[in-house]
Amino acid sequence: MRGRLTHPAQRRLRRKSDFEAAYARGRRFGNGFFAVTAIPNDIGGPRLGLAVSVKNAGSSVERNRIRRTIRESFRLHQHELPHVDLVVSARGRARDAAGSELRASLLALWQKVTEQWPAPSHS
């Protein structure tokens, strides 16, 4: 059975040290819209951190749209992901992309992460 499709606080990266650890020792994946840095964790599930800058995403409306899209994709696919900390950074092309393009791009990145570290099976 799939777990609940929520995004509780324990599934979020918040501390600067968590972001720094991911950037220093994590594996990078990317495409035209996003860069993902992933590092295994001992938390028992994936955690998400966002880095959506004014430089790459423009106005607050666009930044928040991109953030919502990332969080929603993570929420829907978190039970298929391995136990890793993920830092997702938006690239400049994400600003003008349609929501469907962003969702497809994120799905491809989640699959790359899962190929690197297979998700534990939920029997």
Language-model-detected regions and their locations in the chain:
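Positively charged, solvent-exposed patches that mediate nucleic-acid binding
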Residues: 1-123
